[in-house]
């Protein structure tokens, strides 16, 4: 019993330490000289607090014990902003604080183990922004009740007080988590080139994406510089010329039983072969489970897979596929060579990375079998474990 009540007191104390609502999260900042957003590797925390003047503050600080400095401090007026999930990022759980009245948008990657906690915290943040005074009173009342020893400290129960415990209450947002991100060793999200990316928003030439720079004004107020362009509903962030050409290639792929000589499937080829937006186009006659749940070693020894790969390469060699070969910088002779399949898969990988369809983070961690796994392998393994 003591451990149960001790846990409740610890959770309540943690909430008090970091304000009304808090969530472990890191920041995303622009890589100098590029239009690539990269994850700040530091452990951090987002939290919100109502000041004595009843102004709502959105904070971010490093979560180190020795760190007390607040790096991000934004004053938010009622309904002035929203905290939304960025579904275009498929290698991590990324949220953005987007201001409705300006071009400000600040990106954060979540460091909690539970994606459900992300959703609940985001809902509370949006409740605070919409109605800071009443929501603050409700949260404080709930925390006071928890501190007296009642075991009702979960955020989901707190959400029920606002009638927002279900997904229906969040229908304006898509909270689907494609690849859960755990705390360090973490899978850090990375956004490719902004001009072609499916995972980043275009910025104007005047925009500065180096991260938020807040300076204190004479009256103690914080003034933030606009750091990124607002979301534009007219822009198709998922556009990919390569996917368009693969769509045109699909009818040319016949369900034949020819066979190519097996070869070892490397990491880059495996990411192309198993990507959910790619494999239905290049392997239309292959059972989806064959690709979705197969590791590199399994595919390298699967004769049925290489039959489907042979059908793909015969389609790539057809005259109608000249445009696809051109953007992959491959000649017909290269495609028809003994190593043509490997060359084509590697060329596809490079194209899809440049267009933002495949997102890489260059973060590695050791798998259960001792083999070093890159982010893509971890993402696929976690997906498979969920399915099982």
Swiss-Prot record:
Pfam families: Rpn13_ADRM1_Pru (PF04683). One of its GO terms (biological process) is proteasome-mediated ubiquitin-dependent protein catabolic process. This is Proteasomal ubiquitin receptor ADRM1 homolog rpn1302. Keywords: Cytoplasm, Nucleus. Component of the 26S proteasome, a multiprotein complex involved in the ATP-dependent degradation of ubiquitinated proteins. This complex plays a key role in the maintenance of protein homeostasis by removing misfolded or damaged proteins, which could impair cellular functions, and by removing proteins whose functions are no longer required. Therefore, the proteasome participates in numerous cellular processes, including cell cycle progression, apoptosis, or DNA damage repair. Within the complex, functions as a proteasomal ubiquitin receptor. The Pru (pleckstrin-like receptor for ubiquitin) domain mediates interactions with rpn2 and ubiquitin. It comes from Schizosaccharomyces pombe (strain 972 / ATCC 24843) (Fission yeast). It is found in: Cytoplasm; Nucleus.
């Amino acid at each position: 019993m003591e451990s149960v009540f001790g846990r409740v007191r610890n959770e309540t104390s943690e909430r008090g330490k970091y304000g009304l609502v808090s969530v472990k999260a890191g920041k995303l900042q622009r890589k100098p000289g590029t239009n690539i957003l990269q994850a700040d590797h530091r452990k951090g925390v987002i939290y919100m607090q109502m000041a004595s003047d009843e102004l709502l503050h959105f904070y971010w600080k490093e979560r180190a014990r020795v760190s007390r400095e607040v790096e991000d401090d934004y004053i938010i007026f009622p309904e002035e902003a929203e905290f939304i999930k960025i579904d275009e990022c498929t290698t991590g759980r990324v949220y953005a604080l987007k201001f409705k009245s300006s071009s400000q948008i600040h990106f954060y990657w979540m460091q909690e183990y539970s994606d459900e906690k992300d959703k609940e915290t985001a809902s509370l943040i949006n409740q605070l922004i919409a109605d800071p005074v009443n929501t603050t009173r409700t949260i404080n009342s709930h925390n006071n009740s928890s501190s007296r020893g009642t075991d009702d400290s979960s955020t989901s129960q707190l959400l029920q007080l606002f009638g927002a415990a279900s997904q229906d209450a969040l229908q304006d947002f898509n909270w689907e988590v494609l690849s859960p991100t755990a705390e360090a060793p973490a899978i850090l999200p990375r956004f490719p080139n902004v001009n072609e990316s499916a995972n980043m928003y275009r910025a104007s030439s005047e925009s500065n994406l180096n991260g938020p720079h807040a300076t204190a004004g004479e009256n103690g107020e914080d003034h933030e510089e606009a750091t990124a362009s607002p979301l534009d509903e007219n822009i198709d962030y998922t556009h990919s010329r390569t996917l368009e050409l693969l769509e045109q290639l699909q009818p040319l792929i016949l369900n034949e039983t020819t066979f190519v000589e097996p070869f070892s499937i490397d990491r880059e080829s495996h990411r192309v072969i198993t990507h959910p937006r790619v494999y239905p186009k290049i392997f239309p006659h292959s059972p989806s489970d064959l690709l979705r749940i197969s590791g590199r070693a399994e595919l390298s020894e699967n004769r049925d897979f290489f039959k489907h790969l042979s059908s793909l390469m015969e389609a790539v060699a057809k005259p109608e596929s000249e445009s696809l070969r051109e953007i992959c910088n491959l000649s017909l002779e290269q495609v028809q060579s003994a190593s043509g399949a490997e060359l084509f898969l590697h060329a596809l990988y490079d194209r899809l990375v440049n267009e933002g369809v495949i997102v890489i983070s260059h973060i590695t961690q050791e798998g259960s079998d001792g083999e070093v796994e890159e982010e893509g392998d971890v993402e696929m393994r976690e997906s498979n474990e969920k399915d099982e």
